[in-house]
Amino acid sequence: MKSIKRIGLCISLLILIIFVTSCDGDNKITGDSKEEQIKKSFAKTLEMYPIKNLEDLYDKEGYRDGEFKKGDKGTWVIRSEMKIQLKGENLESRGVVLEINRNTRTAKGNYIVREVVEDSDGMTHNHTKRYPVKMENNKIIPLKQIVDEKVKKEIEEFKFFVQYGNFKELENYKDGEVTYNPEAPIYSAQYQLKNSDYNVEQLRKRYNIPTQKAPKLLLKGSGNLKGSSVGYKNIEFTFVENKGENIYFTDSVYFNPSEDKYNY
């Protein structure tokens, strides 16, 4: 009789475990599917690449949730930035952040030059210069007169990575280093690329990258894997990552409520 009761208890516990697991399945990522679900989450954004004409974003809808107010068409925020620190030198970054407002059909932002300097006490300080810009006819145009001819030329020739990047081969990236923290939630997948990779070749055409090392591609995001206007999704190509020596390129495309304020 006791044996029958024990068997019945075990069966009941087993049924309960199966029920709880199935109910919670949508919020959990199984070990075998982490990489695949992260790639699928990024694919929703990366499938847009390339957008050769950024003005197409005025008519392109993004992911919407309860954070958007009624009637708000949303704002696309795009950013591309190259960061280089050679041995014995300061870290310097150059890039553009652009807010493409679908309500007003205007696009404004900044060309940003930033230098990170370390003082004698080991404290770091950011020296940042911002040059206001706008987009018209798919071109980045300074809003103020620029004396520095180098900066002026960089702005005139600037292209966002989303305009020439291509991730059609994303599914072919295999055996990535995957991390996932469901409590934050934060997730990432990293892949070793070759210099023959299309996106690597495109970056080398546009930037003077002082190394022949092939980069690693890092897909890093936060928020709900299924989609959310709260959180971020960043792409990073890391060529060199050492103490006192860093070379990497970052890119991001967000779709957010227009009233959100952006710090850059």
UniProtKB/Swiss-Prot annotation:
Subcellular location: Cell membrane
Signal peptide: 1-22
Lipidation feature positions (N-palmitoyl cysteine): 23
Membrane topology: Lipid-anchor
GO cellular component: plasma membrane
PROSITE patterns for the chain: PROKAR_LIPOPROTEIN
Lipidation (S-diacylglycerol cysteine): 23
UniProt entry keywords in alphabetical sequence: Cell membrane, Lipoprotein, Membrane, Palmitate, Signal
Pfam families xrefs: DUF576 (PF04507)
InterPro entries membership: Csa, Csa_sf
Protein family membership: Belongs to the staphylococcal tandem lipoprotein family.
Protein name: Uncharacterized lipoprotein SAR0444
Native source species: Staphylococcus aureus (strain MRSA252)
Lineage, uppermost ranks: Bacteria, Bacillati, Bacillota, Bacilli, Bacillales
